[in-house]
Amino acid sequence: MKIGFVGLGNVGGKLAGSLIRNNFDVTVREIEECLTNEFKLLGAKVAKSPKELAEQTDLIITSLPSPEVSAEVMESEDGILNGLSENKIWLEMSTTDEDEVKRLGNKVISKKAIPLDGPVSGGCHRAATGNIAIFVGGDRKAFEKILPALTVMGRKVLHTGELGSASVLKVITNYLASVHLVALGEAWTVAKKSNLDLVKTFKGIAVSSGNSFVHETESQVILNGSYNINFTMDLVLKDTGLFDNLAKKLNTPLEISPKIVEIFKDGQKKYGPIAW
């Protein structure tokens, strides 16, 4: 199976790297030429456009920063849609909106190709080691066909149901992680001002009912004096906004979600969109 990979950013680059290391035939496309050159040195082929990439490969993967960018890569004149043909598979690994992935999915189907959504969860550090979780929605047979590729990118792979279901689950998990991160920041502030031993505090939280994946990973970064959790303000606002909009679409009033969006909007205003 020939694999095309569009988007070599924080997560996408690590996923594509796992495929290359495991000897898959990979063609890449990325607007940042320095990243393209890096992957060429690793053994990847380089496509001149998303359309060319889709024409040359069987499984086309997109891992992009926003639904708007995904739409541009798919629908532009030299985009993926114009390079698709019968039985090719498009796997959208970006964090996106359920309605948007279904809209693009219908266009993929019109080309007699097969759409799947396959967002990931677990953070960049896990993506780098092939230890990330992958949720996949869409045709079960197509899912099984690409499973060998999925299992080298992620250790835990879950088929979630119909197209779009994986994107909904991903938005929910990212919302929970964002809430945990905000709560963790407040907890560490109080712990420090209470003059607690922070190493013992870390261990105490880890063995208590207050533990979480976010604590086990991000608290270590915080204790090392860094804010760099490989996730910027603009990305967390995108994710929390997707969850908040989903709740509104479902006519489900929420209390915490709007406050979380407000907190990160304030953070972006103070520190900028690319602050950690």
What is each residue range found by the language model?
Residues V26, V46, P115-L116, V157, ...:
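Hydrophobic beta-strand scaffold residues
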Residues L15-A16, L104, A149, V190:
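Hydrophobic residues within alpha-helices
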Residues T96-Y175:
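Rossmann-fold dinucleotide-binding core
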Residues M1-S63, K88, M93:
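NAD(P)+-binding Rossmann beta1-loop-alpha1 motif at the extreme N-terminus of oxidoreductases
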